[in-house]
Amino acid sequence: PYIPRRIRVTLSPEEAEEYAAARRMYTNFIRAHQIDFSERDGWTRFIMLSARLPGGRDAMKAYLKQRAIAQCSRAKLNIVWDIMRENRSERIIIFTADNDTAYRMGEIFCMPVLTHKTKAAERKDFLDRFRSGEYPVLLTSKVLNEGVDVPEASIGIVVSGSGSTREHVQRLGRILRAKGGKQAVLYELVSDGTS
């Protein structure tokens, strides 16, 4: 009932350079302080040490920068635009890993954004307008992963995500509700050369 499409995205030379520099700063810090993310307290330890140690704030900023580049590069934005343009008659849900990416894209594309911060009345209004076709596209960061059926959507675009199978299945479920025998498509945008 659906077609999966994975699209590999290449960072621009400038973005690749910025990504590499930020990643290097971040990984140098975690190596120097023997932070192991496979341990239960790895992330907590990184946060604590980045707040306390010299170079820690820079390491945290570098972590956030490399993540932002991988999740929302110019190439990804261009591909999202192309997919929306090619599928004007379809309802589209765009999934992001975090609120910042969703809000950034919402500003760029002038689209409604649903996050956990969206008040219930506004969320209902957005979904009603989406269902009616007034809003052909919705942007969301995880809030539609569970518990909300949007059978009108036939296109999903995963701009960034956790990579977990559970999240993938939940997102796919948002666009695979039976309605008129539609053929749904789930695009997954993956940045090459990023972790």
Predicted segments — roles?
Residues 1, 17-18, 148-150, 164-169, ...:
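Switch/connector loops and helix/strand junctions flanking conserved nucleotide-binding motifs
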Residues 99-100, 118, 163, 176, ...:
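Short, glycine/serine-rich, charged loops/turns that create anion-binding
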